[in-house]
Structures are given as C-alpha cells and as structure tokens.
C-alpha cells in the first residue's frame, strides 16, 4: 500500500484522521474542521478547512478531492471547483470548496464528512507539436459522435 504524509494542523483532527468507509472504498473521508455549524445558502460557495495538510511527494501520483455522492444527490452539496486537484508538491492545508447548488439552505456541522480524497497515478507528458494527427477511426468526432448525445 502506498503511504501518504499527513500533517495535523488542528489538534481536533488527531482523532478524526481520514478513513476509508469500507475495505473497498477508493476515497478517504475528509471532515469539516470548523468551530460551529455553517449555514450554506442556495447558490453559495464556502471554503471549508479540513485541519490537515498532505504531501504526496511522488510526482507519479496526485490527490483528488471529490464530492461525497450522498451529499450531492440528497442535499445538492458538491464541490465549487467540481474536482480539487492536489499536486504532488503541494504542502498546504486541504480546503474544500463547498457549493450548495440546491434550492434550500444546508447546515454543515463540525466534523461532518464533507468530501473524499482519492490518490491516483498520473503521468506528466512532453508536448509534441504536429501538423496532422495519425488518422483514427473516430477522428474529430466530438459530443454525441459515438452514440446518443
């Protein structure tokens, strides 16, 4: 198993470190490290601290902050930036851009599970400028070109 360096920035998080919900879970649950409940109005976006910093270190990996499916489906709470990309050399606090895309207010409680952190392999590439691409069966077919739009 790959290891991930984590720094506790708020002592309350020492007993609330991210965990996998099940043995098959891909994401570690991130919690809202806040002093009191936050009310998020419809259409509002707030930046929520996690009280943690991570250091991926290995440039072959990156961490991604993703929404929790239940919060999105049942309460319309998603990420304001849709996906949070944490580069391997970033060492600052993990913050969760939290957007209420729904029509009712949402009350975020202290230490509530808010998002999930997934670590995945990535590959940096070297750009190669060409005049034409080698032909493929799809070509430049875009949205809906391989089925129903």
Swiss-Prot record:
Main EC class the enzyme belongs to: hydrolase
Function, in words: This enzyme is involved in nucleotide metabolism: it produces dUMP, the immediate precursor of thymidine nucleotides and it decreases the intracellular concentration of dUTP so that uracil cannot be incorporated into DNA.
Cofactor: Mg(2+)
Entry EC no(s): 3.6.1.23
Reactions that this protein is recorded to catalyse: dUTP + H2O = dUMP + diphosphate + H(+)
Record-stated family: Belongs to the dUTPase family.
Keyword entries, A-Z: Hydrolase, Magnesium, Metal-binding, Nucleotide metabolism
Signal peptide: none
Protein name: Deoxyuridine 5'-triphosphate nucleotidohydrolase
UniProt KW Metal-binding keyword: yes
MF terms (GO), sorted A to Z: dUTP diphosphatase activity; magnesium ion binding
HAMAP family referenced in this protein's UniProt entry, alphabetically: dUTPase_bact
Superkingdom as given in the UniProt entry: Bacteria
Pathway(s) it belongs to: Pyrimidine metabolism; dUMP biosynthesis; dUMP from dCTP (dUTP route): step 2/2
The keyword Magnesium is annotated on this UniProt entry: yes
Coiled-coil residues: none
One GO term of the biological process aspect: dUTP catabolic process
Organism: Polynucleobacter necessarius subsp. necessarius (strain STIR1)
């Amino acid at each position: 198993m790959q290891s991930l360096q984590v720094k506790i920035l708020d002592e309350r998080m020492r007993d609330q470190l991210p965990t996998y919900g099940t043995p098959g879970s891909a994401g570690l649950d991130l919690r809202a490290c806040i002093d009191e409940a936050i009310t998020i109005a419809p259409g509002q976006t707030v930046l929520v601290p996690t009280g943690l910093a991570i250091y991926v270190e290995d440039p072959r990996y990156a961490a991604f902050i993703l929404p929790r499916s239940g919060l999105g489906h049942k309460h319309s709470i998603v990420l304001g930036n849709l996906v949070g990309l944490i580069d391997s050399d970033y060492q600052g606090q993990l913050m969760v851009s939290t957007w209420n895309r729904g029509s009712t207010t949402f009350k975020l409680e202290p230490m509530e599970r808010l998002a999930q952190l997934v670590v995945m392999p990535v590959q940096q590439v070297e750009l190669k400028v060409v005049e034409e691409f080698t032909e493929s069966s799809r070509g430049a077919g875009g949205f809906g070109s391989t089925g129903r739009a």
